[in-house]
């Protein structure tokens, strides 16, 4: 088994309940916040265990002389290694363990795990500053959900977006394929009446 054989499974969206949200920016009046989606290091480990349980490893090396606990992580999946730096947050959570978790998530993104979260649209929501949480959590768009959580048209929309991710295909048949999926997605939202239904008698 090669990395290319499991790439799509590694890159697959996580269930909505596994995606957490944290404020990236809060307005001066503390009434609204720009929410950022993220996953836990355990989600990364679970994904790796599900896809290639005996073919991945993670190593960390402490980076000396930094203000916050910092490590260099190396994630190896099916013989391919990716490295990145992990840094612990400020405050009580600033531990080497937190830095290692950060490094694991950053390395995992290089394999496509959770990378789609960086493509989410900006989501500003009402912010409850007393509770330090959003009044209502943001909603994930259709394409950022696993198949079983999508609406009937969601799968078609994802197919079209996959083909348009980099550029509009020049091949006429591929253009027709994109159009077919977009039409099916829109049709699921606004079903087209069949036959003479809706016509004047």
Curated annotation (Swiss-Prot):
Molecular function terms from GO: DNA binding
A Pfam family reported for this protein in Swiss-Prot or TrEMBL: Rad52_Rad22
Inducing or repressing factors: Induced to high levels following extreme ionizing radiation exposure. Also highly induced in response to desiccation stress.
Domain of life: Bacteria
GO BP field: DNA repair
Keyword line: DNA damage, DNA repair, DNA-binding, Stress response
InterPro entries assigned to the protein according to its UniProt record, in alphabetical order: Rad52_fam
Subunit text: The truncated form (1-160) of DdrA forms heptameric rings that can assemble into a 3-ring structure.
Functional note: ssDNA-binding protein that contributes to the ionizing radiation resistance of D.deserti. Plays a role in DNA repair and genome reconstitution, in a RecA-independent process, since DdrA is essential for recovery from severe genomic fragmentation as a result of exposure to severe levels of ionizing radiation in an environment lacking nutrients. In vitro, binds to the 3'-ends of single-stranded DNA, and probably protects them from nuclease degradation. Thus, DdrA is part of a DNA end-protection system that helps to preserve genome integrity following irradiation or desiccation.
UniProt note: domains: The N-terminal domain (1-160) is sufficient to pilot the oligomerization process and to bind specifically single-stranded DNA, but is not functional in vivo.
Family according to the record: Belongs to the RAD52 family.
Name the record gives this protein: Single-stranded DNA-binding protein DdrA
Protein species of origin: Deinococcus deserti (strain DSM 17065 / CIP 109153 / LMG 22923 / VCD115)
